[in-house]
Amino acid sequence: GFAVLEAIARQLSDDIWVCAPAEEQSGAGHSLTLSRPVRVRQHAERRWSCTGTPTDSVMMAIGKLMPEKPDLILSGVNRGANLGDDVTYSGTVSAAIEGALAGIRSIALSQVYSKEGMGDTVPFGAAEAWGAKVLRPLLAMDMAPRTMINVNFPALSADAVKGIRVT
């Protein structure tokens, strides 16, 4: 999902900065790392991982790594839906919330999938094909300050997706 997120971001801008958790953080919610130092490792220019949570990653990026606040924070692409009560457990959604709390337009992206017959494989085709198409109109909208958007791509192949609906 992370490679798909980068591909989507590159369709929107050439000025991409990445800071993500070094390890899987499913179910991390809006937690912070308080019991140990958060370590940052640089992998390339404008590309880091940190030993903390998704929220730690956002805080580290905007507070320490970037020279100025970004125009946009994208979080995801999460494996699975972030709908209903699940959003409260989601590190993906919480990273976007942290960005919004910092006054930055923030969008969480998730790819819904069906586990039946797929094992651990998540088809990110819908997110990959539709990501930038969904984000462009969202970015053109006026948003109230400290607002985040949560996008879920359906469990369909990219060509089976018929369009976009904002709810």
Task: Describe the role of every protein-language-model region.
Residues L72:
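Short, Asp-centered acidic motifs that coordinate Mg2+ and/or phosphate
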Residues V122-T167:
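Electrostatically charged, flexible surface regions
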Residues A9-K64, E68-K69:
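A cross-family phosphate/adenosyl-ligand binding-site feature
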Residues A81-S90:
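Glycine/threonine-rich flexible loop motifs
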Residues G1-R10:
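N-terminal beta1-alpha1 ligand-phosphate binding loop
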Residues E24, T53-P54, N78-A81, L156:
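Short glycine-rich anion-binding loops that position phosphate/pyrophosphate groups of nucleotides
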Residues A22-E23, Y113, N152-S157:
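Glycine-rich beta-alpha junction loops
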Residues A100-P123:
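Glycine-rich phosphate/pyrophosphate-binding loops
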